[in-house]
A protein has these predicted regions:
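Cytosolic catalytic domains that perform sulfur/thiol-centered chemistry
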Residues: 1-128
């Protein structure tokens, strides 16, 4: 197994994107965490989200009764509702770089594109 560095984004790239908006940043955490209405489960993190990010909670991509991803058409609709098109460049993050893998795989299912993830996620970017 060989790491593909083009799939993994660093904090510096995220900070540059806040200014230049080269890609869409998708926060995969629950809406209450995204909007800063609840405390973060990890100490030392502020509430909220990375500027310009859109929120698609990873659980919204899953059919909880079947315990699998929703149908492709449902997933496309979910992303389209957030003004994300198949041709967009998208980077996913979450709280720790784990649950955003669900959204990243969803993106692959929808588009066939290799997903990109900000591994540092909110646990790095959201430090007080």
């Amino acid at each position: 197994v060989k790491e593909n560095k083009s799939w993994i984004f660093k904090k510096k790239q995220i900070e540059e994107n806040i200014k230049k908006k080269k890609f869409i940043l998708v926060d995969s955490r629950i809406q209450d965490r995204f909007e800063g209405r609840v405390e973060e489960p990890r100490p030392g993190l502020k509430r909220g989200h990375i500027k310009n990010a859109v929120n698609i909670p990873f659980k919204d991509c899953v059919d909880l009764e079947k315990n699998m991803l929703k149908d492709k058409s449902e997933l496309e609709k979910l992303f389209n509702q957030k003004n994300i098109r198949n041709t967009d460049d998208v980077v996913f993050y979450c709280g720790s770089g784990t649950s955003c893998a669900v959204n990243a795989f969803t993106w692959y299912k929808i588009t066939g594109k290799s997903p990109q993830i900000y591994m540092g996620s909110w646990s790095e970017f959201g430090k007080k």
